[in-house]
């Protein structure tokens, strides 16, 4: 019999993560690497594991994620979003818990565009009175 896999997409900033969740023993693989290899910082690993830790399903599912775009922080957020969405597909009773924690909401914060006449989005050129 084919193994059940739950697929979900997660997004954060400019990163997009495709996440497959299947019953297993808790392996998390990101872009064909172990999560520990791919995310060098402990804070990023914690972010990725948050939905599993909150729902107490850390050792019950294997996660395979393919993530593109953005930096490591955005990618970690995208994987977290994808895992949370996939968990809801796997077990709809987890939805209220994940919703309350805010893991099912796409974080709308994006980089503000640079404006002409300014150095960055808000940074004005240095002003000299004399």
From Swiss-Prot:
InterPro entries: Ribosomal_Su5_D2-typ_SF, Ribosomal_uS9, Ribosomal_uS9_bac/plastid, Ribosomal_uS9_CS, Ribsml_uS5_D2-typ_fold_subgr. GO terms for cellular component: cytosolic small ribosomal subunit. PROSITE patterns: RIBOSOMAL_S9. Pfam families: Ribosomal_S9. Keywords: Ribonucleoprotein, Ribosomal protein. GO terms for biological process: translation. Belongs to the universal ribosomal protein uS9 family. This is Small ribosomal subunit protein uS9. It comes from Caldicellulosiruptor bescii (strain ATCC BAA-1888 / DSM 6725 / KCTC 15123 / Z-1320) (Anaerocellum thermophilum). The lineage of its organism: Bacteria, Bacillati, Bacillota, Bacillota incertae sedis, Caldicellulosiruptorales.
């Amino acid at each position: 019999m084919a193994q059940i896999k739950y697929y979900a997409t997660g997004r954060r900033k400019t990163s997009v993560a495709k996440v497959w969740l299947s019953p297993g023993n808790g392996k998390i693989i990101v872009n064909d690497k172990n999560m520990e290899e791919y995310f060098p910082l402990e804070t990023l690993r914690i972010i990725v594991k948050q939905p599993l830790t909150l729902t107490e399903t850390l050792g019950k599912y294997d996660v395979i994620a393919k993530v593109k775009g953005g930096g490591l922080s955005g990618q970690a957020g995208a994987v977290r979003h994808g895992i949370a969405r996939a968990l809801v597909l796997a077990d709809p009773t987890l939805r209220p818990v994940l919703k309350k924690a805010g893991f099912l909401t796409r974080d709308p914060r994006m980089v503000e565009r640079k404006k002409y006449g300014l150095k960055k989005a808000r940074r004005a050129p240095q002003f000299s009175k004399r």
